Amino acid sequence: MSEGPIRVAPHPIAKRVKHGCKTPHVSHIDDYRSQHRETIGHESDKWWAKKAHELLYWDRPFHTVRSGSFENGDIAWFPEGGLNASYNCVDRWAFKHPEKTAIIYEADEPGEGREISYAELLREVCSIANVLKSFGVKKGDTVSVYLPMTWQAVAAFLACARIGAIHSVVFAGFSAEALRDRMQDCKSRVLITSDEGRRGGKAIATKAIADAALKECPAVEKVLVLKRTGNPVPWTEGRDVWWHEAVARVPRYCPPEVMASEDPLFILYTSGSTGKPKGVVHTTGGYLLCAALTVKYVFDVHPDDRFACMADVGWITGHTYIVYGPLAIGATTTVFESTPVYPTPSRYWETVEKYKLTQFYSAPTAIRLLRRLGHEHVNKHDLSSLRVLGSVGEPINPEAWHWYNEHVGKTECAIVDTFWQTETGSIVVTPFPGAIETKPGAATVPFFGIEPAILEPTTGKVLEGNDVEGVLTIAHPWPSIARTIYGDHQRYLETYMKPYPGYFYTGDGAARDEDGYIWIKGRVDDVINVSGHRLSTAEIESALITHTGVAETAVIGTADELTGQAVYAFVTLKPEFKFDAENEAGLSKELILQVRKIIGPFAAPKRIYIVSDLPKTRSGKIMRRILRKIVAGEADQLGDLSTFADPGIVEVIKEKVASAA
């Protein structure tokens, strides 16, 4: 973590939100403060009960708003209540305005997408629910979903929820081994997949990968296969069933199963420090409420808005902000099958212009990539429909923030740099469009019901006031907090509740600046201690990326005999940057001086490696853990690399580090 207080001037509230045709849901900072106090005060249950009734339909009323504690790991919200997530996300709106667009499906190839109405979505959801019932799936069973980014993936989620089955969605870029492990762990009886997927003009062999995984999953009795491309695929008679053929044989309506608020809605696997994925369990009532609340308030979504989250449904961002959040409030959501650069770097902006999207939610990795490719791809499109721009996945560096603001938002859109995790279920720290001025790189303020506590890492003491930095925790339960790790509640308690008793441990460092804004400083294990100076890797990376030639960076700490730890940086360069490989030492010196100038001599990297790419997962997350192991001489302990976008880059980096030793 950095030394000294954070000093950044705020940007004014965005013109298109403050002076637009729609009044913001939270229109002044005093309104935010008043509501936030209400949601964490002694009578906060009244606020939560009111919102639960406003935003959700309950088949069975609740009398208790919340019970349980972090210490006991027995948190529950609206426990007597009964509802169905599918009914809340589809039926309500299909009955009210059947022809309204529920899903904008932008297919991989431009021109092949279409819009799906709430009425059509209801028919498809009910049909798939009946197919699952014909397979013998019942309430409490687990169904694995391994689908590409088609609109039918959304229908699969909601079909499971409709009959009380628990869905376990696996990102369609994961390997057969990763899929196998997840299906075995959650004891799936049915898998939903496709013949193939399409992304960036390339085919993804989903069915072939699924078949390889199924060789070691004898408990899976049925495989429902969506025909996406129509290409020949391996087939097991008696087990495999075509989606379109199954749908034709079942009734077009399926009554929703009333679920207890605390019944599991889904299991989603996330990486664990031990290497074994954790099956994070989210329940129905509390999760759905926070999904709806955050879409409405964080993105200022109104009934006729067209919301676009560019994530994959295989991640929590897709679960909450493609599927459950937008549909729970009756908005139009977007399923984007392609990549930001296929067939050209204008693809995102063509999509915004074509559908007149009003909110756009993407990741810093994509924003940095598009910035690197030039703003001319943005400037030729009409993006005037946009009001709110979102960022998710990691803190957005100021350079990317400014580019996003100036070239995509034309300095008139609100930018919400959101912080949350798979385990939190929904956004927990964020700006509020229309109410709060923003600072580039700041996560800003807690969402309703969230009471962050910044603790001194060693003692666990709460650091009060502003200009403090420590470990980020949350002081009280909120509705969408994960309830357990599937099959291992003890691991859940030890990971999140035991490190700082009485608080939920996020695993991230944070600072609160002079204005009370919260800044996420990266994972606690991404903090480097150099001669007693605690440095944030994110801050060093931001300093490096201000160099005109730098595209992306990844900074790690490694053991050093003299200073305890030393800073090592891996850097990729922009394609247009003229670089003589013979002068790598000269460029490295420039970059070191850049960090010394921006942060201070204590933050200067000891070694900089210029590389062609960084090790990333298919979702774009940079795997700094891999870089740490390579530098530490533990390259034989890297584990499974099958989830990487380009596993070959690891070998290239290993050779680079070895040759520089």
Curated annotation (Swiss-Prot):
ATP binds at residues 393-395, 417-422, 508, 523, 534. InterPro entries: Ac_CoA_lig (IPR011904), ACAS_N (IPR032387), AMP-bd_C (IPR025110), AMP-bd_C_sf (IPR045851), AMP-binding_CS (IPR020845), AMP-dep_synth/lig_dom (IPR000873), ANL_N_sf (IPR042099). Pfam families: ACAS_N, AMP-binding, AMP-binding_C. One of its GO terms (cellular component) is cytosol. It catalyses: acetate + ATP + CoA = acetyl-CoA + AMP + diphosphate. CoA binds at residues 199-202, 317, 531, 596. The keyword Ligase applies. One of its GO terms (molecular function) is acetate-CoA ligase activity. One of its GO terms (biological process) is acetyl-CoA biosynthetic process from acetate. This is Acetyl-coenzyme A synthetase. It comes from Coprinopsis cinerea. The lineage of its organism: Eukaryota, Fungi, Dikarya, Basidiomycota, Agaricomycotina.
